[in-house]
Amino acid sequence: MRMKRRIRTDVCLILCGILVWFLADARQLRLEAVKALTLCAGTVIPALFPFMVITGLLVRLGFGQWLAPDMAGLMASLFRLPGCAGSALLLGLVGGYPIGARTAAELYASGDLTRQEAERLLTFCNNSNPVFLISVLGAGVFGSVRTGLWLWLIHVCAALLTGLLFRGLGRGRKTVPPAISFQAPSLPAAFVSSVRDSAGTMLSVCAFVTFFYVLISPLTALPGPWAALAVGCGELFSLTPLLPCDRTGFLLAAGCAGWGGLSVLCQTAALLDGTNLPLAPCLLGKLTHGLLSALLAAAASFWLF
């Protein structure tokens, strides 16, 4: 009890310090917020919103059930998951953060996954998309599509290895069968609900991107690669202008893309709110994904730099 009270006190003191900083530097923070909102309007929303609508529509129309027979053997043998879980993995790899987690939560809500299966899936299905890794990081930062392809390959391999490491998660707990049987809605109803829910999710994503963009802005003044490391741990979109175009930058890019940042973690927490799914499996999975990505990048860097 005393420990909890002490932690609560420390958190309140930190928040009070942040509030004082916000008040003392309001003009600069406003400028940073404008930059973040511009980033959301110009990059985040165009990159994510169409994917969110389509993936939501696919899940509602039974894409997981359609894919299940073809993915059943692979998902069961490697990850101890049903075939429909493959849709969350594939859509997460194509659509980017936080579409994998959103698809997993929808599969759980529709009754296609048990809670234990959904927790296991959350450890490795939430990933960055190839456009960000290949175009933004590879071509934009390192001036090489080949380097971007290596970043994407490392990201995918690390995600699959993370799934293998956590395939035993929840093994000792009783598995409760899903309580809801799948019933596909009509196409107009599925489309309307997908757009509506995606708009709400997009608003939440942009809110977290903006807040963390402002919060970590002082960290950009850190020397050398420390700025990229600190910023990448908080918000992924703010990382790109800070990465050095060398082996160190490559390791940081791979590791931070695997981790996703506190902003992505908060986006995932918002998606899981009300689903009865804990955030802990996703947190452990992203920490593992980031570490494995950095290790694989260290090995690949000898051929690239």
Summary of predicted features, one role per range:
Residues P46-T103:
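Membrane helical hairpin/interfacial module
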Residues M1-L13:
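N-terminal membrane topogenic signal
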Residues F63, F191, V195-G261:
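Transmembrane helical segments that form the transport core of multi-pass membrane transport proteins
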Residues L15-Q28, A33-V53, L57, W152-P223, ...:
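Selected transmembrane alpha-helices and immediately adjacent juxtamembrane segments
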Residues L78-F142, A230-C245, F250-T275:
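Alpha-helical membrane segments and immediately flanking helix-loop junctions
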Residues K35-T43, P69-R80, A109, S193-G200, ...:
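Short amphipathic alpha-helical coupling elements at transmembrane boundaries
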Residues R6, A109, F142-F182, L271-F305:
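Juxtamembrane and boundary regions of transmembrane helices in multi-pass small-molecule transporters
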Residues L23-V34, R60-G64, S135-L137, V145, ...:
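Transmembrane helix-loop junctions in multi-pass membrane proteins
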